[in-house]
Amino acid sequence: MSTNKSFSSETSERYSRALFEVANETNELDKIENDVRNFQSLFNSSSEIKNFIQNPTQSKNTQNNVINLLSENLGFSKNLKNFFLLLIEKRRIFFVKKISESFLRLCS
């Protein structure tokens, strides 16, 4: 990787490649790509969701509950839901916008 890349860019690319590999290996690439587009649309259109996800003071438990609810209501793939839960566990959920953008670039 280029040394000029920021930590957030490198981290986002690493996570997006991991999601891409899981989606590809489980033959869910189209489904997860569509789910990520739906999530990205929600994230970009809802300041409440954006602020909630980017707020570092939110507890992991609260973030997990919100992701579980969103996943259920929007019909996200189990793999995408688990990926979001991993991001929360690793305290990387605030990278979700960059990860989503990077993932969608990989899909195109």
Stretch-by-stretch model annotation:
Residues 1-108:
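Elongated, mostly alpha-helical coiled-coil "stalk/stator" tethers of large membrane protein machines
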